[in-house]
Amino acid sequence: MKIQRHIVAAIVTVLGLGFGPNLSFAEGARTDNQIAYYQQLLTRNPRNSKAYYGLGDALIRKAREIGDPDYFNRAEEALKRSLEIAPNNAGAMRHLAYVFYSRHEFEAAATHARKAIEMDATDGDSYGILGDALLEVGKYDEAKAAYEKMMQLEDSLYSRSRLAGMKSFHGDTAGSIADLERAIAVGKEAKQPAESIAWTEWQLGSDHFALGNLPEAERCYLQSLKTYPNYYRALAGLAQLRAAQKRYDEAIDLYQKAIAILPMPDYAAALGDIYAKIGRPEQALQQYELVEYIGRLSSLNKVLYNRELAYFYADHDIKLKESLELAQRELDYRRDIYAYDVVAWNLYKNGKAEEARDAIEKALSLGTRDARLFYHAGMIYHSLHAKDKAKEYLARALSTNPFFHPIFAETAAQALKQLERSVQQAGVEGQGQGG
């Protein structure tokens, strides 16, 4: 399972909206009560634009909390109704941009974010959503500019977290971690929603895990669960960590809990890999079948898992032709580094190593420190008999995070040893011939 920044892209992959409408509501009220509150207001006055905006905001929050995309559909209806009544409501336009983003409709998200900025150029969150959409299509310089503008307007949990993500993409992991720590502190001071703070704590844990720092990752995941009990992202993150610690029974239990809350294909695949690792193939197969079932069902509900399925198929050497088609389809609307990585991995698995090399070089272009990227690069160069580069990237994968996957980390180590032996053998033979 890949839980590093922006890899978990199934339903919602970025922080939510910085603020809601200026309507009085009791501090700490549950999201369900907020939804009921705004619905009650609309019963009294069906043309209350702010109430529709508030309802849309609450529905988005609910979607983030439980991962149910239907709440985004309901939020879209409420926000469009708000804009029909009050066309210049920048907040509603910004929230609508976020709904489009959640569905991976990145062009529509960017368009609506720009409209929101035209209505209110001082709204930092609109710049944040614009940056998110630009990031997903690989426009990194434009995304960075949007995030920097957001930061100029507001030093918040949301702006800090986004800048942290940009730093992580460019390999500045220390800067990313520092920004996330500051984001959490700022978020707590501003009494931001618990889910937003928990998301940031989970992301901080994921950044530590990506560097193989298990104690810090554990601390962050546990804190995320304390902030927002049963938070599915933190449960899955802790499950991955327990697997790295070889505490497999605990990892299985945690993944099962996360899947019960939100059945994401990444989680089911990761659980299946643990079963495979500990010699329980029948249960592994059940989870792998669940991955495909989730993918089919989600497609019917217009939730796209092309990337997740393409990684899953390639990782497990099944449906490789279909998998490559899914990966290449990603490039039709997403051109971030992981779109190129999933294409590279699938080209490699389909025996097209030369093409895979071109794609993996694009995936590595920002200098992102991701063991999974390095592993893919190492295996691709290995297949091309580029021994030096293969050794370099496999070694980087293991030095970056020796726990990056319960199965593939061992594969990387074995491939690296094989390469080192072959190089040593070639050296001995060369000396013999020279003598």
Regions of interest found by a model, annotated:
Residues 54, 95, 129, 162, ...:
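Canonical tetratricopeptide repeat
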